[in-house]
């Protein structure tokens, strides 16, 4: 028997970081939120989706990595990192961001078709938000009902750009875009009229089903599932089995 055969094989431990004091293993190249989600750990988020590259616009997934703030959807996991997410400070920061989103748009949950299936609403509940903290903007935004199968309600848009990315990267149609600056930033429809009905978007497009809020809705299905029996009515966002806990 050779010396090599007689040697005890040492199995290397997978690379890992700590998330709120608990070890999370990761695959090389994964971001913190990817590794955490794969391990069944919830980090609040709105614009992140596992099907797409990180966007980093909502900042709801902000965590502290070795004491420094960073977006969990863009920061790569590394061995030995000490990541904090579920802290009083970070949750207060997230709650403030959510309160700002609610007043910047027109989000009226009791009458919204998306209630109980809305990631914004579910995340607000998760963060303990009970009402607006800031003065409502009440912006004047249109509702586009020009498409035979899809309703487009700009009042609820949170500028996550998931529909923009889905239409461009999956559907290969580029139906949506973002225009404007500051508080005037808005979702645009890429047609001469600016109407969704003048695009080639269909109900089967990924962009038609990925909206985490109530901006893009299929017509004639609004209350097919009664309020009280919807996804987030039955189970909070932090306990959801979906890989992103949000948009399907």
Q: How would you describe each model-predicted region?
A:
Residues 2-12, 16:
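Terminal leader/tail segments of proteins
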Residues 3-4, 59-63, 68-248:
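Fe-S ferredoxin-like electron-transfer domains
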Residues 16-19, 63:
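A short beta-strand micro-motif
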Residues 21, 49, 152-155:
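Aromatic-flanked redox-active Cys/Sec active sites in thiol-based oxidoreductases
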Residues 21-23, 191:
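Short, well-ordered turn and helix-capping elements at secondary-structure junctions
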Residues 23-78:
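N-terminal cofactor/phosphate-binding cores enriched in small/glycine residues
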């Amino acid at each position: 028997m050779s010396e090599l055969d007689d040697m005890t094989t040492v199995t290397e431990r997978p690379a890992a970081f700590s998330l709120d004091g608990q070890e999370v293993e990761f695959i090389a190249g994964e971001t913190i939120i990817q590794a955490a989600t794969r391990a069944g750990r919830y980090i609040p988020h709105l614009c992140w989706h596992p099907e797409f590259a990180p966007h980093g616009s909502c900042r709801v997934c902000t965590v502290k990595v070795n004491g420094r703030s960073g977006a969990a959807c863009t920061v790569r996991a590394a061995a030995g990192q000490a990541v904090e997410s579920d802290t009083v400070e970070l949750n207060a920061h997230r709650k403030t961001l959510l309160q700002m989103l609610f007043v910047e748009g027109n989000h009226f949950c009791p009458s919204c078709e998306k209630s109980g299936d809305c990631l914004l609403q579910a995340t607000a509940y998760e963060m303990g938000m009970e009402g607006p903290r800031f003065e409502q903007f009440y912006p004047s935004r249109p509702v586009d009902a020009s498409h035979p199968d899809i309703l487009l309600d700009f009042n609820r848009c949170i500028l996550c750009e998931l529909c923009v990315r889905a239409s461009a990267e999956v559907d290969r149609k580029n139906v949506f875009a973002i225009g404007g600056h500051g508080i005037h930033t808005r979702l645009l429809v890429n047609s001469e009229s600016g109407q969704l009905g003048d695009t080639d978007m269909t109900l089967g497009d990924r962009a038609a089903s990925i909206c985490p809020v109530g901006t893009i809705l299929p017509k004639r299905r609004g209350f097919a599932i009664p309020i009280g029996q919807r996804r987030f009515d039955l189970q909070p966002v932090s306990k959801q089995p979906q890989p992103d806990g949000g948009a399907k």
